[in-house]
Structures are given as structure tokens and as C-alpha cells.
Regions:
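Glycine-rich ThDP/TPP pyrophosphate-binding loop and its adjacent helix/strand module
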Residues: 22-26, 32, 80, 84-281
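Thiamine diphosphate
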Residues: 1-127, 192, 276-348
Length: 348
């Protein structure tokens, strides 16, 4: 699935280098933003940025893409590759899961730090999603989007790669609705960044960054940013086709693409040291963000010792006197299974 990884490279680069609050050295940092690649089939979109940013992947890992035992399986897998927040692949599931992530963040914020001004709490973070046409076609994403709008999850930002191509070529054979209007009806904040707005295709990362900044400031509604792209651009003969969605470029097209972007078509897997030095400055940026967050967190912990103790217990997976919390059915002669299950779940 090279097409989306090629045309969304500037979008993913922008997220990792300029937007996401992450620490490459600590993928479990409590204060991190969460990134979910709902378009999990385009796993290279994320893997390349994890390599460039020094987040645990190296060039040999990219060479081992989609091979048994590698850190770069065909779809991102949670618990297998650092900085992958959740396993994705089934279309639409990533948007639905991200809604749950955003809901959980708001619950966490309300539990531990409800009175601090927005943006000032160590428990403030955003959930960012990259999704494609296939994700937006699925019913599960529609249901989740409806819930996210109803719950006013302003910490959720979805970047929708609207390239209008699927593995069956143009999506107009099955998908022609006004997605922006649909999400507006769900109660979302909707913006559009069109890379093809002018006569010449321009990867308008500045416009996209402005849209993301506006989404971050929209605290009462989830945000959808419709990014209109050409899949596989600037691949000379396969861009904007279903072939580049799910099939390898092939040696001839790859050589043409490298030539088009000023690379040596005879070289493979070459990343100039100065490029890596630049992108891996993400590590220093992450440490700076982490240091600033640590100060906020330490101040919160000093002012809220009981809440800090609760946080430590929850992070440690400790449930005090669990058996005493569970309902006792020893004297019950008859009860519907669903009722007993409900009592047990509610107690937990």
C-alpha cells in the first residue's frame, strides 16, 4: 500500500515534527498526545516517521517491512512496535477507537484535575487520527463520530485523506456523499485544506498547520480536517489510480518517481546524514516538552496528594478488596444472566 504513504508523507511529517507532544525516549509517557493511524493498511505512513524521528525504528526495520517477526508488520500492532497506540486495520475501527481514547482522556482529566484551566493541566492532551475514504465509508466510524459530536470531544482531531481512490479505483462507484456536511451535522468542527486548490498541486503544509492549530483551539467540538490529496503524488504514471493504492510501484515506476523528486534512481534506502540529524531533533523537542510537563505534574502531585495516590494505584492495576466490591449471588434463586452480569460490571 504505497500510495497513501507517499502522498501523505508531508502530513505525517508535520504531525510528528511540529504537532504531536511525544517523547521518542518514552512511548508510555502519561502526558503524550495519542496518534492513531485508522488507515492501518498504510502502515508506512507511520513507520517512516518513527524512523526519521528516532522513535525506535531504524533503516533495517523499514527494509523488513511486512516480514515475519519484524517491527514493521503490514498493519501497526500495539505492544509490538513502540509508539503504536492501538492495532489498526479494519476500516473505520481507528476512528471509533480514537473516540474512546478521547472520551477516556476527558474522564481522566475530570477525575484527577477538574478545576485547572483548559490547556494548563498535565492531563490535557489531544488524540490525532489519520483516516481515509475507506474509513469514512464504514458504519462504525459514523456511529463513533455521532457519539463524539454529541459528547463534544474537543480533544479529538481527525485528518481525513480525501483522495477519492480505493483499491477499486475512483470511489464514486459507491461513495459520493458530502462528508464535510455529514460531520457538521454530527456537531463537528470541519475545515478543508485542498492541496489541489490552485492550478498546480501544492502540498500546503502551512495551511494544514493553521487548520490543526484552529482545531486545537476548538475545545467544545471534535474536529475533522478534510485534506484533499492526490494519492501517490508525485508518482509520474500511477498517481491517482487504484493500482498505487494497494500494489507495489515496480522498479520502473520507482525509478521515475526518484528522478521526479531529484533522487538518484540507482540508490536504494539512502537517507543523507544531515536529513536524519534534522528529523531526529524530535528527540530534543520531546525532552523539552517532557521537562515542561514534569514541572506541571510535580506541582499537581504536591497539591493533590490523594489524587496522586489514586493515580499511582490505577497505573499499578491495584484494586483494593476487590471481592468485597463484587455482588453476592449466594442467596439468589433466580436472576437473568444479563442482570447479574450488569451488577458485576457496574461494581467493577
Amino acid at each position: 500500500h504505497p500510495g497513501t504513504a507517499i502522498s501523505l508523507a508531508p502530513v505525517a511529517y508535520l504531525l510528528y515534527q511540529k504537532v504531536l507532544q511525544i517523547d521518542p525516549h518514552d512511548p508510555q509517557w502519561l502526558g503524550r498526545d495519542r496518534f492513531i493511524l485508522s488507515a492501518g493498511h498504510s502502515s508506512l505512513t507511520q513507520y517512516v516517521q518513527l524512523f526519521l524521528g528516532g522513535c525506535g525504528l531504524e533503516l533495517d526495520d523499514l527494509k523488513a517491512l511486512r516480514t515475519w517477526g519484524s517491527l514493521t508488520p503490514g498493519h501497526p500492532e500495539y505492544g509490538h512496535t513502540d509508539h503504536v497506540e492501538i492495532t489498526t486495520g479494519p476500516l473505520g475501527q481507528g476512528i471509533a477507537s480514537a473516540t474512546g481514547f478521547a472520551y477516556a482522556q476527558r474522564f481522566e482529566r475530570g477525575l484527577f484535575d477538574p478545576d485547572t484551566a483548559p490547556g494548563e493541566s498535565p492531563f490535557d492532551h489531544h488524540v490525532y487520527v489519520i483516516a481515509g475514504d475507506g474509513d469514512l465509508q464504514e458504519g462504525v466510524s459514523a456511529e463513533a463520530a455521532s457519539l463524539a459530536g454529541h459528547q463534544e470531544l474537543g480533544n479529538l482531531v481527525v485528518l481525513y485523506d480525501a483522495n477519492q481512490i480505493s483499491i477499486e479505483d475512483d470511489v464514486d462507484i459507491a461513495f459520493s456523499e458530502d462528508v464535510a456536511a455529514r460531520y457538521e451535522s454530527y456537531g463537528w468542527h470541519v475545515q478543508t485544506v485542498d492541496f489541489g486548490e490552485s492550478q498546480q498541486y501544492v502540498e500546503d503544509v502551512d495551511g494544514l498547520l493553521n487548520a490543526i492549530t484552529a482545531a486545537q483551539q476548538e475545545t467544545g467540538r471534535p474536529s475533522l480536517i478534510v485534506v484533499k490529496t492526490i494519492i501517490g503524488w508525485p508518482s509520474p504514471t500511477k498517481q491517482n489510480t487504484g493500482k498505487i493504492h494497494g500494489s507495489a510501484l515496480g522498479a520502473d515506476e520507482l525509478a521515475l518517481l526518484k528522478t521526479a523528486v531529484g533522487m538518484n534512481p540507482e540508490e536504494t534506502f539512502v537517507v543523507p546524514p544531515h536529513v536524519l540529524d534534522h528529523t531526529r531533533a524530535l528527540r530534543e523537542r520531546g525532552q523539552r516538552l517532557r521537562s515542561e510537563w514534569d514541572q506541571k505534574f510535580d506541582m499537581w502531585a504536591a497539591q493533590n496528594p490523594e489524587r496522586k495516590a489514586l493515580l499511582d494505584r490505577l497505573l499499578g492495576g491495584e484494586v483494593p478488596d476487590l471481592e468485597a466490591l463484587l455482588p453476592d449471588f449466594s442467596d439468589v434463586e433466580s436472576m437473568a444472566t444479563r442482570a447479574a452480569s450488569g451488577q458485576g460490571i457496574n461494581a467493577l
